[in-house]
Design a protein with these regions (language model features):
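Short alpha-helical linear motifs
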Residues: 31, 52-55, 70-74
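A ubiquitous structural signal for well-ordered alpha-helices
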Residues: 14, 31-32
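PIN/NYN-family metal-dependent endoribonuclease catalytic core
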Residues: 7-8
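Short, flexible segments with low predicted structural confidence
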Residues: 1, 21-22, 33, 41
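A structural signal for well-ordered alpha-helical scaffolds and beta->alpha junctions
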Residues: 26-30, 43
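A short, surface-exposed loop/turn module that caps and links secondary-structure elements
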Residues: 35-60
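Generic detector of bulky aromatic hydrophobic side chains
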Residues: 30, 38, 47, 87-88
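Enriched for short, Lys/Arg-rich terminal
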Residues: 2-4, 13-26, 62-91
Length: 91
């Protein structure tokens, strides 16, 4: 069973801005979301819990430089996307 990815209005605006600035990453971004929907624990996503001010959030990698932060509601198999950007922007 696939996970349900929830795109908030705020995240959708951030993602559109991210793709506008980095059109070369659009395919990688889409592939990351597709893999996240099928298996958020896939090794290539490098899913990990965040600490400090982002405690309660998780992060997955688009590539070595760019990340998506998210919340995971494991019991309902929902993933709520929070932010997208480079390491310094999302952390």
């Amino acid at each position: 069973m696939n996970w349900q990815i929830i795109f908030t209005e705020q995240y959708t605006r951030k993602a559109a801005k991210f793709i506008k600035i980095h059109p070369d990453l659009e395919n990688q971004y889409v592939k990351t979301l597709q893999l996240l929907e099928v298996n958020p624990h896939h090794a290539s996503l490098r899913l990990h819990a965040l600490k400090g001010k982002l405690d309660g959030l998780y992060s997955v990698s688009i590539n070595l430089k760019y990340r998506i932060t998210l919340t995971m509601i494991i019991t309902e198999k929902e993933i709520v996307l929070v932010n997208v950007g480079d390491h310094s922007q999302v952390y």
